[in-house]
């Protein structure tokens, strides 16, 4: 094992550990709260489910990383690759849609518009979110089912490639695989568009609210303004981290067709782990209960608060 492989394994292991800790923290805090009160808000439910999916996603990515390093032939074999791709695709798409649903929920609860359509959605926010979550599940199943044709084409052109008979038929099949693989990325467009729309509405709502505050001569740092800013930070961070994740996903997916196949796959795998860990940490900072518990935990660790003291999770 060379220096590059060693650095790859260290980075993968570090990001995996941090991601697991962050998402398990969310599970522990929200799970403890639900256990005590037997109630869970819609936003907490989405965040908790999202954290669980990201734990699974991180495990899939780590497994993929170790197979790339220690058993590349097994990784590229038909059945193993298909199991990883199916698990990754379903978990990945569902987690992205849940993050999108969270952005829509924040938008409907915080933004203020007088348009009849927006008011209709705002008054029925719980029902809207239930339908969005069901739609997210169906779309995630659809994106996973779309892999069937991709698997068939991949099997055909890999079989031709193994014979080292690079014919026009081989080039045609490879082009078809490229096309289907690229078209498969279009499943990412709907959640991105919805997230961008939620972000835009919150920006417009914040601008109008700020102008009203200035006209009334009141402070612009009121709870409504802070809620707008917090939601905007969460949605914007998801948007940019997802773009980075999408780039990494493309690098990892098309690694077989790049000059330095193994290096491309390793870079892609390391980059993909940053999103499920980074965005979950931002969710902690944007959620008052999670943030307070996190601060209390840090104070306990640093010795500024006695372990017996009651923080948000114990109260």
From Swiss-Prot:
- Report how it sits in the membrane: Multi-pass membrane protein
Which keywords accompany this UniProt record? G-protein coupled receptor, Glycoprotein, Membrane, Receptor, Sensory transduction, Taste, Transducer, Transmembrane, Transmembrane helix
CC annotations in GO: membrane; plasma membrane
Cytoplasmic side residue ranges read: 27-41, 115-127, 207-233, 287-315
Where, per UniProt, does this protein localize?
Membrane
What are its GO biological-process terms?
detection of chemical stimulus involved in sensory perception of bitter taste
Identify the residue ranges that face the Extracellular compartment according to the record.
1-5, 63-93, 149-185, 255-265
Q: Which residue windows are transmembrane per the record? A: 6-26, 42-62, 94-114, 128-148, 186-206, 234-254, 266-286
Which residues are tagged as glycosylated in the record? Answer: 165
Q: What is its main location?
A: membrane
* Gene Ontology molecular function terms on file: bitter taste receptor activity; G protein-coupled receptor activity
Q: Which CDD domains match?
A: 7tm_TAS2R3 (cd15020)
UniProt entry tagged with the keyword Glycoprotein: yes
Q: Which family does it belong to?
A: Belongs to the G-protein coupled receptor T2R family.
Also noted in the record is: Several bitter taste receptors are expressed in a single taste receptor cell.
Provide the function of this protein.
Answer: Gustducin-coupled receptor implicated in the perception of bitter compounds in the oral cavity and the gastrointestinal tract. Signals through PLCB2 and the calcium-regulated cation channel TRPM5.
Name of the protein in its database record: Taste receptor type 2 member 3
Q: Which lineage is the organism of this entry classified under, starting from the top rank?
A: Eukaryota, Metazoa, Chordata, Craniata, Vertebrata
Q: Which gene is the coding source of this polypeptide chain?
A: TAS2R3
């Amino acid at each position: 094992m060379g220096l590059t492989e060693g650095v790859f394994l260290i980075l993968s292991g570090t990001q995996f550990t941090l991601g697991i800790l962050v998402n398990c923290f969310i599970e522990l805090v929200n799970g403890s709260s639900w256990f005590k009160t037997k109630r869970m808000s819609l936003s907490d439910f989405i965040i908790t489910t999202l954290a669980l999916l990201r734990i699974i996603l991180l495990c899939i990515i780590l497994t993929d990383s170790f197979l790339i390093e220690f058993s590349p032939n097994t990784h590229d074999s038909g059945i193993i690759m298909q199991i990883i791709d199916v698990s990754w695709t379903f978990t990945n798409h569902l987690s992205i849609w849940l993050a999108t649903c969270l952005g829509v929920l924040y938008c409907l609860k915080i933004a203020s518009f007088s348009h009849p359509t927006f008011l209709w959605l705002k008054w029925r926010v719980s029902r809207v979110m239930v339908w969005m979550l069901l739609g997210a599940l169906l779309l995630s199943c659809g994106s996973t089912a779309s892999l069937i044709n991709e698997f068939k084409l991949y099997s055909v052109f890999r079989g031709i490639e193994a014979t080292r008979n690079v014919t026009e038929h081989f080039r045609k099949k490879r082009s078809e695989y490229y096309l289907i693989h690229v078209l498969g990325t279009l499943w990412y467009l709907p959640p991105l568009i919805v997230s961008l729309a939620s972000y835009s509405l919150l920006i417009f709502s914040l601008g109008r609210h700020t102008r009203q505050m200035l006209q009334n001569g009141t402070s612009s740092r009121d709870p409504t303004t802070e809620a707008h800013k917090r939601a905007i930070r969460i949605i914007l961070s998801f948007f940019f981290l997802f773009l980075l994740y999408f780039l990494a996903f493309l690098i990892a997916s098309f690694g077989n067709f790049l000059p330095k196949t193994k290096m491309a796959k390793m870079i892609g795998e390391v980059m993909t782990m940053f999103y499920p860990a980074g965005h979950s940490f931002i969710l902690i900072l944007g959620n008052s209960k999670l943030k307070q518990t996190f601060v209390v935990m840090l104070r306990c660790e640093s010795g500024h608060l006695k372990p017996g003291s009651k923080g948000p999770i114990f109260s």
